[in-house]
């Protein structure tokens, strides 16, 4: 699993926190950030440079002109797919945690209101005696 990341020397893909991708001249720069350990001020990161792939394509439908374009390297595309799986999985976990906390707060509110209602009913019973 995560063979492309492992080929970059990343032995523990689960330690990845996030990544950034930018274009610089004819290169794509991938920066991978890892989770901070306790006591660290900055997250550890590694940077990789991928040359953009050059392609010559037909410029218009008449077939008379050609133009050269640059696009992302196929290897980088595979690495990004793996990074997206890791980072999106963490986002799903964060969303689930937030949902559970929201549900818990709602339950707390409902129970609190119900307790107040029951106490009021008890108060009515004791006043009628």
UniProtKB/Swiss-Prot annotation:
Q: This protein's superkingdom? A: Bacteria
Pfam family for this entry, one: DUF3461
Q: Which family does it belong to?
A: Belongs to the UPF0325 family.
Q: Which NCBIfam families match?
A: PRK13677.1 (NF010213)
* Name used for this protein in its record: UPF0325 protein ECA1027
């Amino acid at each position: 699993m995560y063979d492309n990341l492992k080929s970059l020397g990343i032995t523990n893909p689960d330690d990845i926190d996030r990544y950034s991708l930018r274009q610089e001249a004819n290169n794509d720069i991938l920066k991978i950030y890892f989770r901070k350990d306790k006591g660290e001020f900055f997250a550890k990161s590694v940077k990789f440079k991928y040359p953009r792939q050059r392609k010559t394509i037909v410029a218009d439908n008449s077939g008379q002109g050609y133009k050269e374009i640059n696009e992302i390297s196929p290897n980088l595309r595979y690495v990004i797919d793996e990074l997206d799986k890791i980072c999106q999985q963490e986002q799903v976990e964060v969303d689930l945690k937030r949902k559970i906390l929201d549900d818990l707060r709602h339950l707390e509110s409902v129970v609190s209101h119900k307790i107040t209602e029951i106490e009021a009913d008890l108060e009515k019973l004791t006043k009628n005696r």
